[in-house]
A protein has these predicted regions:
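Short turn/helix-capping motifs enriched in Asx and small/polar residues
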Residues: 1-74
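Acidic glycine-/aspartate-rich tracts in secreted/extracellular proteins
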Residues: 4-6, 33-34, 122-123, 175-179
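A short, charged
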Residues: 50-84, 155-186
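A structural/positional concept
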Residues: 97-98, 116
Length: 207
């Protein structure tokens, strides 16, 4: 549903999408036989009013690729809406797959993106990833601790659960690759003003 902020996944995935830089919407352009989704570059043909895939050498042909199925859907909007993505199990993306998407999306739009990984109370494995909208995010690392949009509030209406009904495993936000390493590798902890996903992953690898 267009106005539903909860991501309704396409169980088949394997599609090509166009990203609208102005509105923040992803538009399904073509269904393919690929195992993963991708976001391709398009331009508006002023004569026909239709979007055409970029093919010339000076045009961006691929904006994002290797996106696990179940993350993107037609008209989903991460810019203006918070979204919840169900992870794990058949036909669903993995936590790592969603993290990869968030990092690449953050780089593509040039803004920080934050969210939570959580499960039902008492469940040890993450079952959902809550991605906060990035409409008001900043790309200035000196303001990382004042940028509220990089630390989204948990919205029960969108999540379908009250905060006391879930266990929060991770809260995260991204730091753009252009940031200095001192900013990108701040520790990430629950409800603390720090933490890039890159640091979180490094700790997991060393743990």
């Amino acid at each position: 549903c267009k106005n539903n902020p909860v991501n309704r996944i396409d169980p088949d995935g394997m599609d090509d999408y166009r990203y609208d830089d102005k509105t923040g919407q992803f538009h399904l352009m073509k269904q393919t036989d690929d195992k993963t989704d991708r976001v391709l570059g398009y331009h508006l043909n002023k004569k026909t009013g239709e979007y055409k895939q970029n093919t010339k050498w000076h045009q961006t042909k691929t904006r994002m690729e290797g996106i696990e199925k179940g993350i993107l859907s037609d008209e989903v909007n991460f810019k203006e809406n918070d979204n919840v993505i169900s992870v794990g199990g058949e036909g669903k993306p993995t936590v790592t797959g969603v993290e990869n998407f968030v990092i690449e999306l953050s780089e593509m739009v040039g803004l920080e993106i934050g969210g939570f990984e959580y499960s039902k109370k008492g469940v040890t494995e993450v079952s959902n990833v809550y991605i906060g909208r990035y409409q008001s995010s900043k790309d200035n690392p000196s303001r990382w601790n004042t940028d509220q949009r990089a630390y989204p509030s948990f919205n029960p209406r969108i999540a379908g659960s009250m905060p006391n009904e879930v266990d929060f495993h991770v809260d995260f936000h991204t730091h753009l690759s252009k940031f200095p390493e001192s900013d990108r590798l701040r520790p990430s902890g629950l409800y603390t003003p720090g933490g890039d996903m890159e640091y979180k992953r490094g700790q997991q690898s060393n743990g």
